[in-house]
Amino acid sequence: MKTHTITKDQLDDQNRYVGEADLTSFSGHIEISADLGFVKFASKLVATGRIRAYSGSGIEAGEGIEAGWGIKAGSGIEAGEGIEAGWGIEAGLGIKAGEGIKAGEGIEAGLGIKAGLGIEAGLGIKAGLGIEAGL
């Protein structure tokens, strides 16, 4: 499976992704290099494989974030809509979604987990601070 790695040269001065690859429906893995801060995506971020942001990098999408495998970020994960992974979702800081959060395996955050709708995991849900869901 191919991997697209996001580096600093693919970001504008507001840390928005401006690279040439279409990451709204990517066939493969998406990786975000370390120490980039929160990398912002105007709409959704979708990969058939995993989505991973290394230490010091986080993911922020205007719409949803979806991975066929797992989603993991050294910092936080935030989506205007839902977050869904076939495997687990893990963030060094918080996980926040305007709608639901769903993982085939576990959901884990160093701080809080918050969803506008429900939170569902095939295995456990763990947060260093609170867990909050609208429904």
What are these language model-derived features?
Residues 1-92, 96-109, 114-115, 120-121, ...:
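Charge-rich, low-hydrophobicity low-complexity segments
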